[in-house]
Swiss-Prot record:
Keywords: ATP synthesis, ATP-binding, Cell inner membrane, Cell membrane, CF(1), Hydrogen ion transport, Ion transport, Membrane, Nucleotide-binding, Translocase, Transport
Family per record: Belongs to the ATPase alpha/beta chains family.
Highest taxon in the source lineage: Bacteria
UniProt keyword Amino-acid biosynthesis present: no
Protein name: ATP synthase subunit beta
Catalysed reactions listed for this entry: ATP + H2O + 4 H(+)(in) = ADP + phosphate + 5 H(+)(out)
Lineage: Bacteria, Pseudomonadati, Pseudomonadota, Gammaproteobacteria, Pseudomonadales
Organism from which the protein derives: Pseudomonas syringae pv. syringae (strain B728a)
Quaternary context: F-type ATPases have 2 components, CF(1) - the catalytic core - and CF(0) - the membrane proton channel. CF(1) has five subunits: alpha(3), beta(3), gamma(1), delta(1), epsilon(1). CF(0) has three main subunits: a(1), b(2) and c(9-12). The alpha and beta chains form an alternating ring which encloses part of the gamma chain. CF(1) is attached to CF(0) by a central stalk formed by the gamma and epsilon chains, while a peripheral stalk is formed by the delta and b chains.
InterPro entries associated with the record: AAA+_ATPase, ATP-synt_VA_C, ATP_synth_F1_bsu, ATPase_a/bsu_AS, ATPase_alpha/beta_chains, ATPase_F1/V1/A1_a/bsu_N, ATPase_F1/V1/A1_a/bsu_N_sf, ATPase_F1/V1/A1_a/bsu_nucl-bd
């Protein structure tokens, strides 16, 4: 356990000088001997015994000359069943005022990704109960899903609904990593889990937006380490990350503070490598699976921005939320033409599901093309076939909406879970013209097709 002294403090970056024969390794955790007991993580070795570190907490009250000790290892966090039902910070310390975490076992947050031989893939579908997702971009068990959307189109609400539906229907363990998001949402989420009686199956790790960049950069790794432990014990784990963009943003802040030259749009030059290091660890092995659902903020609604563009490469399914669809009052505001999944293959999901999904996409795409003609010349100028197609498209568009359980408080409508079988049957019926006689308003904000038929009787 060598010790050194602080020689420079610039924001969250602290330089510490050690004797030359005992310089700490990269990623070692250092402890500042002060009242706050701040933890530092070594990022660079500058030579002459000086290391540049990033603080995992506030640097208020620190000054030059304070003693710092090297722990000799990376940051480690508690893992295992004792973490379930608890809220922890980036260092694995409990922040829910419910006493210490009762486990001796701790794992370092920097771990190698599973080797090629250890990895395992699967094609089992994971039903979410959300019509548009199950139909157009089905999730795979052990797959990686991204929820892409700009500000305020419903990423977190969709994420909460997915957690509610999957965590309640799915009997395994879940880990939720709140990376640089609102503390209020973290609090809402905790109470949502508590009220649904699934809190004892969820471990919560928060590094919210008011915390220093070091915390936001590492909190995703803390959550992932806990998920890896459950996976290696042979469980099927769900890992929720909200929001992966804030992880990139924290990396940008740290990179600038460390004096690296920025790359495209001001992002860190190591963007792809940092994302790869995180994403390659989120994978399924022969022991167990990690199914991960990640919210991805899209700056200025531009999907070609380097951050969302780098994330795309790692995902099996992408759910794109659209502001145009949200402005029509259709929630969830998922764009069925922009969202994709690797599972959308007749050999995986079956011919009926595949044909229905592609049929829905064809009708919506054709409607999109006809919109300009309708805007200029009106509906009367369309051929009978096109008129019929437009009417069906409008019904499909409305039938893709659905009341959420987590939004009951705001909408007053009770949430609906729609099975995959009912989803396919409903859309297939609309495509075949079985419901051409029903008004389009009957399809808005309902669960299955039976409910739409009932609603039509009241209109």
């Amino acid at each position: 356990m060598s010790s050194g002294r602080i020689v420079q403090i610039i924001g969250a970056v602290i330089d510490v000088e050690f004797p030359r024969d005992s310089v700490p390794s990269i990623y070692n955790a250092l402890e500042v001997q002060s009242a706050a007991g701040t933890t530092l993580e070594v990022q660079q070795q500058l030579g002459d015994g000086v290391v540049r570190t990033i603080a995992m907490g506030s640097t208020e009250g620190l000054k030059r000359g304070l003693e710092v000790t090297d722990s000799g290892a990376a940051i480690s966090v508690p893992v295992g069943k004792a973490t379930l039902g608890r809220i922890m910070d980036v260092l694995g310390n409990p922040i829910d005022e419910a006493g210490p975490i009762a486990t001796e076992e701790r794992w370092g947050i920097h771990r190698p990704a599973p080797s090629f031989a250890e990895q395992a893939g699967g094609n089992d579908l994971l039903e979410t109960g959300i019509k548009v997702i199950d139909l157009v971009c089905p999730f795979a068990k052990g797959g990686k899903v991204g929820l892409f959307g700009g500000a305020g189109v419903g990423k977190t609400v969709n994420m909460m609904e997915l957690i509610r539906n999957i965590a309640i229907e799915h009997s395994g363990y879940s880990v939720f990593a709140g990376v640089g998001e609102r503390t209020r949402e973290g609090n809402d989420f905790y109470h949502e889990m508590k009220d649904s009686n699934v809190l004892d199956k969820v471990a919560l790790v928060y590094g919210q937006m008011n915390e220093p960049p070091g915390n936001r950069l590492r909190v995703a790794l803390t959550g992932l380490t806990m998920a890896e432990k459950f996976r290696d014990e042979g469980n099927d784990v769900l890992l929720f990350v909200d929001n992966i963009y804030r992880y990139t943003l924290a990396g940008t802040e740290v990179s600038a503070l460390l004096g690296r030259m920025p790359s495209a749009v001001g992002y860190q030059p190591t963007l792809a490598e940092e994302m790869g290091t995180l994403q390659e660890r989120i994978t399924s092995t022969k022991n167990g699976s990690i199914t991960s659902i990640q919210a991805v903020y899209v700056p200025a609604d531009d999907l070609t921005d380097p951050s969302p563009a780098t994330t795309f490469a790692h995902l099996d399914a992408t759910v794109v939320l659209s502001r145009d669809i949200a402005s029509l009052g259709i929630y969830p505001a998922v764009d069925p033409l922009d969202s994709t999944s690797r599972q959308l293959d007749p050999n995986v999901i079956g011919q009926e599901h595949y044909d229905t999904a592609r049929g829905v996409q064809y009708v919506l795409q054709r409607y999109k093309e006809l919109k300009d003609i309708i805007a200029i010349l009106g509906m009367d100028e369309l051929s009978e076939t096109d008129k019929q197609l437009v009417n069906r498209a409008r019904k499909i568009q409305r039938f893709l909406s659905q009341p959420f359980f987590v939004a009951e408080v705001f909408t007053g409508a009770s949430g609906k879970y729609v099975s995959l079988k009912d989803t396919i049957a409903g859309f297939k019926g609309i495509l075949n013209g079985d419901y051409d006689h029903l008004p389009e308003q009957a399809f808005y904000m309902v669960g299955g097709i039976e409910e739409a038929i009932e609603k039509a009787k009241k209109l």
